[in-house]
Amino acid sequence: MTASKGEYILRTFSKIQHKKWELYIITRIIHLLDDPELEFVCQQLIKTSDEKRYLADLCFPELELYFEVDELQHSKIEHLSSDKNRMKEIIDATNFTEKRISIYDQNLKIKDLHQINREIDLVIKFLINRKKEYLSKNKFNAWDYNNKYKPDIHIKRGYLDIKDNVSFLYHRDAL
């Protein structure tokens, strides 16, 4: 038996409980967005063609979009270069769009909470518009958590398509 959608969301947030700014920003986005049709994943594993593994802070698979929260460690010179390479590799592997939210300003001071909240508001507008765009192009499939891992829908249809973002709990379900 799979966990309930509520349990899934709580487990997802628990993955980032020790990253205080990431937790604040991501939970604020999800709570203010308040869209049960949008699947989201915290710390989404992304594997590149050369087997490198990266974690995206917040991923919206159906919108082909992921977010990175730039905390202070991202401001160091050595991180800036590796972040650019990481972004390129993730985009090459997924063809997703990356968006970033920085918690620090150009002087490496933590931004005022009001300023961070305004950036989050812009992110939410972007997400809403992206969903509208995908709906208008008939590219959006609403998140159906209760049926996400059930193979019956795909068996009836008779095929799997990578664009459908299909997931199964067991290997046997894909066979």
Please give the residue ranges for each predicted region.
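Nucleic-acid endo/exonuclease domains
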Residues: 1-175
